[in-house]
């Protein structure tokens, strides 16, 4: 329960940054469990390949392997929640140390608030810390349902794969196999969307924490405007998620058509495309986090050297 509390609670300002976060260990254990599931599916497939009569077992081994990949993604998501906790520890540490490091500066005259340019792109200068950008506020809300629903759908798909293995009627087997694939890959898409929202939550914490530190020093607050990489990240994330939902609907249609093989031939690449788009968005989110960290390093150095 203590580990779960770390997911949603900002640590107190006097929290020891050297402490080991339980949630990180949980994330690593979950990730290793996912690797074990994928390895088990691989071994099972090797045995199935040598037994033509057992080809129907490929249905459940598929379900197990996809469940393994989803479990690895869940482990990544859990570790990211620990990073959010570390981020707030960093904010509190900087708030405590920066006043002692800050150069003495004469009081500023009138300050021209508004848009400014920085080495890391356009920014704004405000008297108070700005609020979160709408996508960041949404990310803080949406990562939890996505991380919850994604594994649930993957497990539903795993159960369907077991029923597919035992189905005697070809039409029933076809329908179950289609729903297995569509359901599991919708769960995979939701998990990647949840990871994307967690990265958005990290960006939200960087924006909020950076403004909080500057405001606590009585300084004008410099905040990056949304970088271009963040805008493309949003496009890719929502595009990939919508495509993941679309493949689920299309697999539902394919479950009852006369020629499912034709549908399966292009639905397979389509579902992989949805995950690829989501992963590309995650790459841009990580790039954006690097940009924001660089900006904050530049701002901290500016405060230390100039006092402003």
Please annotate each region the language model reported.
Residues 39-54, 156-172, 245-259:
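Membrane-helix interface motif
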Residues 12-36, 130-152, 221-241:
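Juxtamembrane interface helix immediately N-terminal to a transmembrane segment
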Residues 34-42, 82, 154-157, 191, ...:
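Helical transmembrane-bundle signal
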Residues 26, 42, 62, 141, ...:
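Charge-rich, solvent-exposed alpha-helical interaction surfaces
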Residues 56-105, 172-234, 259-308:
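Extended alpha-helical segments
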Residues 1-17:
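Short, Lys/Arg-rich, polar N-terminal cytosolic tail immediately upstream
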Residues 26, 33, 37, 52, ...:
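Extended, solvent-exposed polar beta/coil surface segments
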Residues 4, 97-137, 211-226:
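Charge-rich cytosolic interhelical loops and cytosolic tails of multi-pass membrane proteins
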